Amino acid sequence: MFDKLKEIIADKLSVNEDEITMESTFIDDLGADSLDIVELIMALEEELEMEIPDEDAEGFKTVGDVVEYITEHTEK
């Protein structure tokens, strides 16, 4: 899951996959703004064929937060 997520993040935020770790924060480490994050969530929803409610997405600060959320919500 992490590798797939890294591909999507690198594409949407125009960063190198090598810069992306589980601890990377979207705003401080990866240079995303709020619009970037919205677009990233939309891309994840499309790629993973799932819906991520806005209130859940607001809690995503790090790449690890997203991996944990997706893992929890796709295993059900």
From Swiss-Prot:
A GO MF label: acyl carrier activity
Family (UniProt): Belongs to the acyl carrier protein (ACP) family.
Modified residues (O-(pantetheine 4'-phosphoryl)serine): S34
Gene: acpP
Disulfide bonds: none
Protein name, as recorded: Acyl carrier protein
Organism, as annotated: Clostridium perfringens (strain 13 / Type A)
GO biological process, one term: lipid A biosynthetic process
Segments forming domain Carrier: 1-74
Pathway info: Lipid metabolism; fatty acid biosynthesis
